[in-house]
Amino acid sequence: MNRNGATPTRGRGKRAIPNPPRRRARGKSVERGSTPLQYVTTLGPSRPRMGQGQGWQKLSHEEIILQVNSSTAADTIQTIPIIPRLSVPAGDKPIYSGSAPHLRTIGSAFAIHRWRALSFEWIPSCPTTTPGNLVLRFYPNYSTETPKTLTDLMDSESLVLVPSLSGKTYRPKIETRGNPPELRNIDATAFSALSDEDKGDYSVGRLVVGSSKQAVVIQLGLLRMRYSAEMRGATSISGVSA
């Protein structure tokens, strides 16, 4: 009892529980969470992607198919036939240029191909400004005469750039959706011997690469081809697929 004769009562309120110490949030430090930026472009072959569907063998890949060197005599004009078995033998004055080792290996095992994606990227070799221009021009046939000068290649269908600058991609206008043309496979040597009309049964077209005349002979750059192709059928032992 207290002095007034009353019995002290106990408070009915709940005793406050002190807040537990907050856990320190784990921040994502730069060392742990970030991924270092990649500044280097790999020029070597990447891992190809392959699959199957509806009787077709699918292949997606990218390859360096051509090294472009300058000439001191005149503008350089090179023609690349768009065929899976691309491997042009070296010669004094070959008609065609280019080589795609992985695509050639796969293409040699099949008789028929069709394209699902196709583009070309220029990779300069000279870090400084190189005078002149580089031109990429796709022709969907072989009957049109190949231009002999750089200016004749320059039109609304071509890509014109400075050889020392990269980052430009050239996409030929070919049918890739739905049911694109099914073409036969053939090696480069047998393909060169065909008439211009018959080449249309094996190739969707040709890429012409032109570069300006230079004061000295130098390597201007590399041409990379990115592609997605589908193939099927058996091949024969000859250069032409059955």
UniProtKB/Swiss-Prot annotation:
Disordered: annotated span: 1-54
Biased composition (Polar residues): 35-44
Keywords tagged on the record: Capsid protein, T=3 icosahedral capsid protein, Virion
Biased composition (Basic residues): 11-27
Main subcellular location: virion
Domain of life where this protein originates: Viruses
Example of a GO cellular component annotation carried by this entry: T=3 icosahedral viral capsid
Matching InterPro entries: Capsid_prot_S-dom_vir (IPR000937), Viral_coat (IPR029053)
Localization: Virion
Keyword check for NAD: no
GO molecular function list: structural molecule activity
Oligomeric and partner information: Homomultimer.
Function comment: Capsid protein self-assembles to form an icosahedral capsid with a T=3 symmetry, about 32-35 nm in diameter, and consisting of 180 capsid proteins.
Family affiliation: Belongs to the icosahedral plant coat protein family.
Name this protein carries in UniProt: Capsid protein
